[in-house]
Each structure stands twice: as structure tokens, then as C-alpha cells.
């Protein structure tokens, strides 16, 4: 679509037994990065004139899903398309996924706040899932990730961390007041070589 798609709220739902895709090595737009138990996307590429605005995903219980828990992105995979505005992922509980817990992409100043993510990747496999993290951002600017708890994230080939700043992370990314424990890959993965106290 053209223009700004605004005012989407997904709140106070229980979402479970979603049989999505958890394979990483699938063709583009068919892999685990293009679906989710809660999946909000924009067809094609975004711009200052064409993007998502005012997206709220809050207070949901998402569990036992074969795919990721929550995902926000655009359909085309371009790391410089950072245009979605006022995206909030808050107060969700995510347990036992087939891949990642939460991924937010293509957003300006997204807020990821007060979520619980346990056992990300519990329903995945080494052959299919390969690389995951609990909560992470990519192609974002000035993301704020705070007051989240992430535990028992699986590690397959690599990664397996609670948090991740991945490709296209720009501006200043802030992690504060989060609690990470018992994740097979540790606390945080940085794919962007960010500078401490400047970029993150």
C-alpha cells in the first residue's frame, strides 16, 4: 500500500500453537524472518511517506509456537529503510518458540519494554533454526530496550543470547534495567561493532 498505515493494536490476547516457519535457510521471504505468532509488516519497501505508525503490541501471552513470538518489519530486506514510527512492544509474555522471541526492524525509536521471554528456540532444531536470540533489533535507529527478562534462550550454531543489536542498527541503542539469565549464548550479541557509551 501507499501512505501511512496507522493505529494497529494487538493487546490482551493468548496466542498459541501457531504452526509457522522456523527454518532459516529458506528462500527469501519464506524463511523464519518473514512470519511470527504476531507479525506486523509493510509490503515492499518503506519510506518517509510509506510506513507503519502507531503500532502497539502489548500484554499478550504467546506460547508454544513453532515460529517467532513477535516480529515487526517490512517485506523487502533493506537495512537502510528505517521509517516505522511509534512502535511499542510492551508487557508481553513469550514462552517456548521455534525461533526468536521478539524482533523489531525498520523502526525509528522503537520501545521494547517489560516483556518476558522464556525458552526461545525450545521448539527449534539445529538443522532448521541455526541462529536466534531472545529479543533483538535490526535496521533500527535509537531503540530503547528496557525492563525485559530473557531466560533459557537456546543456542544452535551460534548466537543464543538474550539480546542482540544486529545489522543496520543506527543511532544510540539503549539497554537498561533488563534481566538476563541462563541463556545458552550469554547476555548480548553485537553484530554492528557499536561503540560503548556512544552507539549503545
Residue locations for each model-derived region?
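Extended surface/linker regions that mediate inter-domain or inter-protein docking
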Residues: 14-16, 41, 62
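Short, solvent-exposed beta-strand-terminating loops
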Residues: 5, 18-25
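Core solenoid repeat modules with strong leucine/isoleucine-rich periodicity
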Residues: 118-134, 138-142, 146-155, 162-164, ...
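Extracellular beta-strand/beta-solenoid scaffold signature
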Residues: 1, 23-52, 64-80, 84, ...
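Repeated loop/turn-to-beta-strand initiation elements of outer-membrane beta-barrel proteins
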Residues: 19, 66, 110, 143-144
